Every structure is written in structure tokens, then in C-alpha cells.
Amino acid sequence: MSGYSAEQRAAMQCMSLARHGLPHALADCGLPHVHLKIGEGIVTRRALLISTVLGSCVSVTFFSRRLQLAGIFHAMLPVITQSYRPCNEPCRFVDSAIEAVYGNFEKRGLHPEEVEVKLFGGAFSMGLREEHPDRCMIDVGGRNVLTAREVLAAKGLEIRSEQVQGTRGRKLLFNTRTGEVWVKLLNNAANQLARRQEEQARAQSARGCSLD
């Protein structure tokens, strides 16, 4: 949108969001929009509208009303491996992502009951029926959700709401000013795109990381 003023870009962004049925509480033209990619996390006190697209990946949102502090990550695998620890990319993995993002809340002296936690994602996109004997072995989304629940519970964090699993991916929009999250289930084309992006990211992780 080069060539447009900041006000014009904000207005066009607002119209684009409105066309997708975004609730008025989230379609605030004054909020800068940030897209969260696989393996990324954000902790901020700025008012932002953060979007991300999930297939088998999961996101957890954290929000403190008292401090107006918000956090979110987009993790693709349940548990960080030893070979990946030195790479300084904790938000690729559910367990280390929770440690990294929630750690910023702990450093500010927040107690678990002061933090609103919501869980999203973990879809199963391989096309196997629930009773298929191999499903539990390749259900990365299910294992992501299970790990998130276990790690959050171990930290005394209650999940206030969640929308997880199923066979369709999700688009999220997280308002860091209010803690609200808007969720839209993906259509088949978007589902396939999200699946391909996650498969490419997992293949990259399987090769390890460079410490150059």
C-alpha cells in the first residue's frame, strides 16, 4: 500500500477486516496489524491486532488486565529437542514457548490467577478417521494441545477458553488491548495452504539449526 498516507492505510485495513466479518470490538482502525509466523512469539504492552493462521500448530494467548500486558506464540511441535535448545527459537515448540512467553509475565510479578489464558489450534489434517490405529502416532496437533494443557496446568494457569483440534485450521486475530480473540475456521484451500506451510517448517526443524 505504498503511496498512501497512514490514515488511508488504516482505513483500507479496517474495510478489509470488516469484509471478513470481524466483530466491531476487534475491527479498531487505530490498531497496528502484526502477522505472527510459525515459531514466533510476541509479548507487548502496545495495542496491536495480531493475526496468525493455525493448522496442527497451536497458539496460546496470555493477557493481564492490571498491567495491560499481552503475549502470544505460534508453536508447531510439542516438545523442544536437545539439538534445538541452542538455537534461541523457543516459540517453535509448545513447552518452551510457554516458558518463554509466560516467563515475561512472571518477571513482572504477576500471579497465575491474574493472567487470562486461551488455547487455540491443534487440528488434525491427515484425513485418518478417529478410530484409525495410526492416528495417535501422527496426530501432531493432538499432542500439541495435550502438551499445552499439561505445561499450563503445571504452572497453575487456568485455560479460560479454548477452540482446539477438529480437522480444520483456524485464523486468529488477537486484540492485545482487550485480550479478545476472534477465530475463523479455514476453508479447504486455506486449510491445504496452512498444512503445506507447517510441513515445510517441520522439515526445516528436522534438519536442526545453524549456529553461524
Curated annotation (Swiss-Prot):
GO MF assignments: protein-glutamine glutaminase activity
Cysteine pairs bridged by disulfides in the record: none
Entry-linked SUPFAM superfamilies: CNF1/YfiH-like putative cysteine hydrolases (SSF64438)
Catalytic activity: L-glutaminyl-[protein] + H2O = L-glutamyl-[protein] + NH4(+)
Domain of life: Bacteria
Broad EC category: hydrolase
Keyword Transferase in annotation: no
Hydrolase is among the record's keywords: yes
CDD domains for this protein: CheD
Known EC number: 3.5.1.44
Keywords, comma-separated and alphabetical: Chemotaxis, Hydrolase
GO biological process: chemotaxis
Function: Probably deamidates glutamine residues to glutamate on methyl-accepting chemotaxis receptors (MCPs), playing an important role in chemotaxis.
Family per record: Belongs to the CheD family.
Protein name stated in the entry: Probable chemoreceptor glutamine deamidase CheD
